[in-house]
C-alpha cells in the first residue's frame, strides 16, 4: 500500500503539531519547576528566620507541593532539586527548557551529566 501525497502531507502536519505541543508542554513543565523552586526558596527563608537548622530549612516544601498537586513528595523534591541546579549551575539549560527548546527529560539528563563537572568546564560544555 502506497501513501498518497495527501496522506504524506497530513502525516507531516500531525508530526509538526506534535512538535509544537511537545514544546508547549516543556514550557509549562519549566514554569511548574520554577514555581516549585520559588516556593521552596520562600519556605526555606521563612524557616531560617524562625531558627530552623540550615540543613533542614525548606525540606517540607516538597510535602506541601505533593499534597497540593497530588503527586509524590519524591517527585516534587526531584523537580525542586533540578530547578535549584539549573538556576545555580546550568543557566543555558534553564533558558532552553523555559523556551521549550528542550524538554524535562533532556534538562534532567544535562543536569545529571554535568553534576560533577568543574564550573569552568561545565559552562563551556553546556
Segments predicted by a language model, with ranges:
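Peripheral, non-cofactor segments flanking catalytic/redox cores
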Residues: 1-126
Amino acid at each position: 500500500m502506497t501513501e498518497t501525497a495527501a496522506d504524506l502531507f497530513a502525516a507531516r502536519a500531525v508530526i509538526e503539531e506534535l512538535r509544537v505541543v511537545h514544546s508547549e508542554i516543556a514550557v509549562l513543565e519549566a514554569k511548574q519547576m520554577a514555581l516549585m523552586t520559588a516556593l521552596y526558596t520562600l519556605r526555606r527563608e521563612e524557616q531560617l528566620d524562625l531558627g530552623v537548622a540550615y540543613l533542614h530549612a525548606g525540606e517540607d516544601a516538597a510535602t506541601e507541593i505533593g499534597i497540593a498537586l497530588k503527586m509524590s513528595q519524591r517527585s516534587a523534591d526531584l523537580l525542586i532539586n533540578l530547578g535549584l541546579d539549573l538556576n545555580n549551575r546550568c543557566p543555558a539549560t534553564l533558558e532552553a527548557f523555559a523556551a521549550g527548546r528542550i524538554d524535562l527529560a533532556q534538562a534532567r539528563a544535562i543536569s545529571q551529566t554535568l553534576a560533577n563537572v568543574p564550573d569552568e568546564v561545565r559552562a563551556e560544555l553546556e
